[in-house]
Amino acid sequence: MNPKKKSKELKRISRENLNGRYRLSMSVFLTVTLINLFSDLPFTYLLGNVYATKVQTVIYYIAEVLLSIVVGVLQMGLIRFHLNMARKKECRISNVFYCFMNHSNRYFGAYIIYYAISMIAKAPFLVARNLFNLSGDTMGIAIALYAASAVLSFIVLVLFPFYLYLVLSRDDLSVFACLTHAIKLIRGNILRVIYINVSFIGMLVLCVLSLGIGLLWVEPYYEQTFTNLFLDVTGELPTVDCAV
């Protein structure tokens, strides 16, 4: 059995994979970001309108859920792009739309499951935000709910980071089987997932200082590194020729 690769080695492989493809990776990330931004603008304006009726507000929240799912499936296309790159397969901007044009029921179903799990984790936060204030007699309840939501969200983050990767990689498994398999894969790898995420904090701070422009470089690097972590966990990475 091949030993697990360290974060430094995964990042080296990722830089090699991105060499000569950084412009394409930036374009893919920018495409997803702009679609997300412009699709959300009309509904953000609707909620920001002080004269918005209750019906309009309800429409906004329904639209937000639907858009979140659509953008999530778009993000799955971004994952597929990086999987193709890591596996030395052809990668192009059209990979972003792969999940809409191929077995869309599977990919939409998978993301709806993931979205539902995420919303369950956020439920205490939503309750606290809408029913309680951080002042007066309800402050303690609000803080407890915020803390509970933070803990649940963290659990989701560390338990299911490989779920969507599995859905895209294992056509032989149902979306529910991918869910249980993702939990099996994370065993013994939680600290690796946390470390990879923490190691990019410094770069993300620089992205904030650059008003987000730095994300064009950092996001593809992070995505490719995490993709290689997934391939390492599944045992596929050692079989991939990492030569440029």
Sequence positions of predicted segments:
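Selective recognition of hydrophobic, aromatic-rich stretches within alpha-helical transmembrane segments
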Residues: 2, 56-90, 137-174, 204-240
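Interfacial aromatic "cap" segments that immediately flank transmembrane helices
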Residues: 2-35, 93-120, 155-208, 244
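Short, small/hydrophobic-residue-rich motifs at membrane-helix boundaries and re-entrant hairpins
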Residues: 3-12, 16-87, 101, 106, ...
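Short, surface-exposed, polar/charged, turn-prone segments marking secondary-structure boundaries
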Residues: 45-46, 124-126, 135-136, 186, ...
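Membrane-proximal helix-loop-helix units in multi-pass membrane proteins
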Residues: 117-146, 150-151
